[in-house]
């Protein structure tokens, strides 16, 4: 059994959708990024890559490569899973937290869990997604950006 940890941050900007866990969440701003900027899925992908000692998301899908422009992070996560499996491992579980002041994510968490479980090809009850604020502190508290953290376990296939 191996453990991985992932972290991602993107700025909130006008004119982009807010996509978290593969769900378009209604909000007046979205996340800036080369891909769809889904911080939750990026953190999960980095956790999986880290657990398998395969580097980070940027090494596999560089923001300098035009083919990843506006990429769907669910598709990127599926590719990460393929690479983890090719290295001889299978995802076992994921625990993730999104840090943002608003909007509230509770109405969307079940769909996020389903999307992550589908990408990882395992049961939804092996995926935990939580959301919290930073009580007005820091860049998240000032609503300048959104952060996500994820931990995962993988096991030999």
From Swiss-Prot:
Q: Which InterPro entries does this UniProt record tie to the protein?
A: MECDP_synthase, MECDP_synthase_CS, MECDP_synthase_sf
What EC number is given for this enzyme?
4.6.1.12
Q: Which Pfam families match?
A: YgbB
Which keywords appear in this protein's UniProt record, sorted alphabetically? Isoprene biosynthesis, Lyase, Metal-binding
Q: Which catalytic reaction applies to this protein?
A: 4-CDP-2-C-methyl-D-erythritol 2-phosphate = 2-C-methyl-D-erythritol 2,4-cyclic diphosphate + CMP
Metal-binding as a keyword?
yes
Query: Which of this chain's residues are annotated to bind 4-CDP-2-C-methyl-D-erythritol 2-phosphate?
Result: 8-10, 34-35, 56-58, 61-65, 132-135, 139, 142
Q: Binding residues for a divalent metal cation, per the UniProt record?
A: 8, 10, 42
Q: Which SUPFAM superfamilies does the UniProt entry name for this protein?
A: IpsF-like (SSF69765)
Which residue positions hold the site described Transition state stabilizer?
Answer: 34, 133
Which PROSITE patterns did the record assign? ISPF
Which terms does the UniProt entry file under GO BP? Answer: isopentenyl diphosphate biosynthetic process, methylerythritol 4-phosphate pathway; terpenoid biosynthetic process
Show the PANTHER family listed in the entry: 2-C-METHYL-D-ERYTHRITOL 2,4-CYCLODIPHOSPHATE SYNTHASE, CHLOROPLASTIC
The record's subunit annotation is: Homotrimer.
Protein name (database record):
2-C-methyl-D-erythritol 2,4-cyclodiphosphate synthase
Organism listed in the record: Salinibacter ruber (strain DSM 13855 / M31)
């Amino acid at each position: 059994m191996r453990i991985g940890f992932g972290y991602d941050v993107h700025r909130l900007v006008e004119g982009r959708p807010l996509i978290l866990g593969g769900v378009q969440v209604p909000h007046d701003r979205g996340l800036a990024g080369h891909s769809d900027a889904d911080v939750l899925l990026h953190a999960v992908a980095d956790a999986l890559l880290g657990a398998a000692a395969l580097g980070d998301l940027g090494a596999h899908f560089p923001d300098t490569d035009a083919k990843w422009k506006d990429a769907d992070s669910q598709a990127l996560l599926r590719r990460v899973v393929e690479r983890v499996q090719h290295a001889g491992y299978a995802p076992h579980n994921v625990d993730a937290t999104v840090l943002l002041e608003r909007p509230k994510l509770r109405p969307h968490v079940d769909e996020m869990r389903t999307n992550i479980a589908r990408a990882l090809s395992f049961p939804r009850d092996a995926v935990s997604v939580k959301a919290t604020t930073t009580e007005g502190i820091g860049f998240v508290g000032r609503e300048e950006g959104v952060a996500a953290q994820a931990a995962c376990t993988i096991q030999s296939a």
